[in-house]
Amino acid sequence: MNSYRVQDLVRNYQIGAPGTITGVAYQASNDAVNAQFNAFEMKLCHTSLDELTDSFTTNYDGNSPEPVSSADPVVFDAAADGWFDMPDFQPFHYDGVDNLLVEVQWMGDNGTDLYTWITNTDTYRLLYHKYLDEDVGFLETIYHRFRITIEFDQTVEEVSWGLIKAGF
């Protein structure tokens, strides 16, 4: 494939709380050895949209996507049903309120197929196009199966130890 660009929408309830995302992995649906993708890049972006539009730019919802992973080339080896991590992942602070837009793109590959598991949904949660310079793509009512690694922000209210001790 000459190039590919895809956006997935992850709903805020699937993540659960604010924190720092330290990794993203996909679940392979086939065995793949030496699957190479050139000029590979992953970006993450907050968005208030609950469903994707057919425009990559509109889906940013006025926010700036942040590059979190890139390699040229990247080579993946994956076992069917196994997870493969994005390379050289840079932390991204997720606000816990918005939905999360996950965008991946590459320019050319070596022809080795690496398929990933998807999940069906009733709303448009995936947008793709085979040309990077096209802003309008093709919508699907599916999304990729991700494993997002996140270090949650403090979720327990700060209280005085005196108040806690007084309760005993």
Spans of features found by a protein language model:
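Residue-level detector of functionally pivotal "anchor" positions at catalytic/ligand-binding pockets or at interdomain
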Residues: I150-F168
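Beta-sheet-rich sandwich/jelly-roll-like modules and their strand-loop junctions
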Residues: M1-E51, N99, D109, T116-D153
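Aromatic- and Gly/Pro-enriched, solvent-exposed loop/edge beta-strand patches characteristic
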Residues: N38-T123
